[in-house]
């Protein structure tokens, strides 16, 4: 009996060992090994002397974490979370900002589906750090879905939909002369299903005649649905276009964009037209290290000068490493609607991980 028990225990031990060895040899797919985890943080100080609304505060402008993967050689996927919520709006809710996959087999035709940046303006899809200033320009913020004039929830310029894009007419060096983007979206912003069952159509086309230079135009037509207490739905139209130009080469950046919008806000209190224009320059003092910058940033909430708000900005940034930089800006702000002029100072420490 003892011999039988000893043999049984030995057989069991060998079986467990064999299973452990088998588990040890289970291969993890290469695309899982290649998943890239990253993130960034933007710590901010702002002070202003605006009458009746003075400000002297530290803020977490953005904290985000993301994962990128290639589950297939021709397929790219990304998920990104915003961890800090919107402290400027008194919200601390964590939210999903990106979740999409893109088939990238051909440069002339790539197909993206999920939640991602709307293909409207040059500035909207830019990374908040490389965009270069204390915030996105007013016209992009109000007319591309950050704090949209239609009343849409803050969506960081994103929506849920399907997009085609590609590069055309490559030259001998492989540099494309033409780029297009066109997409169909819900029109509601992030993390929300369509409400009025209508879709937004957004597209852009730009030419790149010289290295670093691109000149483009964008169009957007659609609506935002709002469900009422009685169950009915109100559709707020959005008809917008933009003209854009940018030169970015040798650490210099020159960029300007004009956006025009036709369509009321949901309460019909702001008129049915708005527009805005910005022009900026970022110039290197020490290449890839120290830059000075200036921006003219105008937005007219009702396309009338009496509703204009203008930022005249100057600043500088110092890049300690590719993952750490310090930004300082001063702005003189003119608000015609309130007949006020005031000063604004912004300091940011930006880092990537």
Language-model segments: residues:
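Outer-membrane beta-barrel pore domains
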Residues: 49-53, 72, 91, 100-104, ...
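Residues in and immediately flanking transmembrane alpha helices
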Residues: 15-16, 86, 128, 335
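Intrinsically disordered, low-complexity regions enriched for glutamine and histidine
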Residues: 15-19, 78, 179, 258, ...
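Cleavable N-terminal export/targeting peptides
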Residues: 1-23
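An N-terminal domain-start capping segment
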Residues: 22-24, 237-238
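Outer membrane beta-barrel
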Residues: 23-187, 195-201, 206-215, 278-284, ...
């Amino acid at each position: 009996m003892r011999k039988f028990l000893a043999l049984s225990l030995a057989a069991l031990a060998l079986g467990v060992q064999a299973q452990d060895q088998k588990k040890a040899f289970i291969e993890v797919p290469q695309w899982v090994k290649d998943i890239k985890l990253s993130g960034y943080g933007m710590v901010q100080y702002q002070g202003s002397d605006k009458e009746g609304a003075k400000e002297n505060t530290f803020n977490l402008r953005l904290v985000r974490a993301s994962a990128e993967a290639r589950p297939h050689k021709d397929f790219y996927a990304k998920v990104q979370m915003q961890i800090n919520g919107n402290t400027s709006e008194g919200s601390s809710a964590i939210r999903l900002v990106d979740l999409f996959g893109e088939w990238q087999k051909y440069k002339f035709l790539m197909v993206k589906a999920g939640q991602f940046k709307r293909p409207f303006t040059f500035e909207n899809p830019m990374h908040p750090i490389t965009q270069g200033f204390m915030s996105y320009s007013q016209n992009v913020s109000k007319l591309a879905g950050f704090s949209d004039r239609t009343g849409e929830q803050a969506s960081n310029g994103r929506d849920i939909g399907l997009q085609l894009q590609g590069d055309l007419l490559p030259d001998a060096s492989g540099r494309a002369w033409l780029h297009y983007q066109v997409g169909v979206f819900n029109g509601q912003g992030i993390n929300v299903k369509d409400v009025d069952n209508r879709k937004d159509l957004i597209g852009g086309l730009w030419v790149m005649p010289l290295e670093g230079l691109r000149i483009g135009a964008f169009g957007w037509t659609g609506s935002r649905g709002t469900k009422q207490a009685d169950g009915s739905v109100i559709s707020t139209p959005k008809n917008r276009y933009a003209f854009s130009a940018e030169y970015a080469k040798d650490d210099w950046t020159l960029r300007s964009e004009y956006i025009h919008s036709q369509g009321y806000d949901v309460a019909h209190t702001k008129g049915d037209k708005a527009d805005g224009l910005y022009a900026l320059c970022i110039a290197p003092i020490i290449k890839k290290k120290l830059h000075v910058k200036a921006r003219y940033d105008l937005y007219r909430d009702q396309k009338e000068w009496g509703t204009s708000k203008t930022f005249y900005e100057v600043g500088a940034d110092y890049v300690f490493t590719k993952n750490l930089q310090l930004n300082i800006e001063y702005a003189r702000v003119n608000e015609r609607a309130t007949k006020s002029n005031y000063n604004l100072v912004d300091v940011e420490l930006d880092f990537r991980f």
